[in-house]
Regions:
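TPR/TPR-like (Sel1-like) alpha-helical repeat modules
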Residues: 87, 91-121
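Long, contiguous interaction/recruitment modules in multidomain scaffold/adaptor proteins
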Residues: 1-18, 22
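Structural signature of tandem alpha-helical TPR/SEL1-like repeats
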Residues: 32-40, 66-78, 100-112
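Structural marker of alpha-solenoid helical repeat scaffolds
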Residues: 14, 48, 82, 115-120
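Alpha-helical segment of the N-proximal tetratricopeptide repeat
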Residues: 15-48
């Protein structure tokens, strides 16, 4: 089996099924800590339904957990641009930036995420 066939066969596997079936498959991969496989399924799903936050957020989380931090950051920025009060995306963006060593840039996102979640420091 040559490499081209293998790649085509692999791509077909990740794109197989309805959007709902692929969403379920991506969640199973993610729950099994198969983050790269989850991301492969989710890329196509996000392209198909770009307006939905759930698949894009799970894609960002899969990228984060598989150390694809620039990709995670890009997906998270799309989410917070569309929905500035999406606190979990803000939290993940802050953590992603921290993990890249960009602590100053992460700070505002982490503070905003905490405020949106109702986590206020005690005076």
């Amino acid at each position: 089996m040559d490499a081209t066939y293998r790649k085509t066969d692999e791509a077909a596997y990740y794109a197989q099924g309805t959007a709902a079936e692929r969403w379920d498959r991506a969640q199973l991969f993610f729950a099994a800590k198969e983050y790269t496989a989850a991301a492969r399924v989710l890329v196509g799903l996000v392209e198909e339904v770009p307006e939905q936050t759930g698949p894009r957020l799970l894609l960002a989380r899969a990228y984060y957990h598989s150390a694809q931090l620039l990709r995670a950051e890009a997906e998270l920025r799309v989410i917070v641009e569309r929905d500035p009060v999406e606190h979990y995306a803000r939290l993940m963006l802050g953590r992603t930036l921290e993990r890249q060593g960009r602590h100053q840039e992460a700070g505002p996102h982490l503070r905003l995420a905490a405020a949106l979640a109702g986590d206020f420091p005690e005076a």
